């Protein structure tokens, strides 16, 4: 099983991830970026997931498709070798509301380890729209813009 297959398997249910599994897919010098923050190195990524696990009741990814990009073997850390499209279903422990979010991840792979991981998703859809008053306002604005 190559690193992309292991990545997809692990991300099926993030709440079941162990630090050893993270080490099996991410390089020691991983650069992990999402719309909220940036993590450098496997220890920061493990801390990020440990924090996520304290807050999430469940977090599952449905991988829609994976695209392989052409790249050369002397790639830099930010060179993208794969693009993964997914739908995340998240339930937080303090709020049983289900959050469903579509997103894309760019991955860079070298020596069967992921050295670059960058997530793209609508942060408003993930966070702001679930704050009662703010969510109402954002949904109203989106509705007016869609007309």
Tell me what each language-model feature is.
Residues 4-25:
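Short acidic-aromatic low-complexity motifs
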């Amino acid at each position: 099983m190559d690193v992309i297959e292991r990545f997809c398997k692990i991300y099926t249910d993030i709440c079941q991830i162990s630090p050893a599994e993270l080490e099996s897919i991410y390089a020691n010098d991983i650069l992990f970026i999402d719309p909220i923050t940036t993590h450098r190195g496997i220890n920061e990524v493990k801390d990020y997931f440990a924090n996520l696990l304290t807050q999430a009741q469940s977090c599952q990814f449905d991988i829609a498709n994976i695209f392989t990009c052409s790249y050369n073997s002397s790639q830099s850390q930010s060179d993208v070798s794969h693009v993964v499209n997914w739908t995340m279903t998240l339930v937080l422990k303090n709020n049983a509301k289900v959050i469903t979010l579509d997103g894309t991840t760019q991955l860079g792979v070298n020596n069967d380890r992921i050295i670059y991981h960058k997530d793209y998703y609508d942060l408003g859809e993930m966070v702001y729209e679930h704050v009662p008053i703010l969510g109402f306002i954002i949904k109203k604005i989106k509705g007016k813009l869609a007309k």
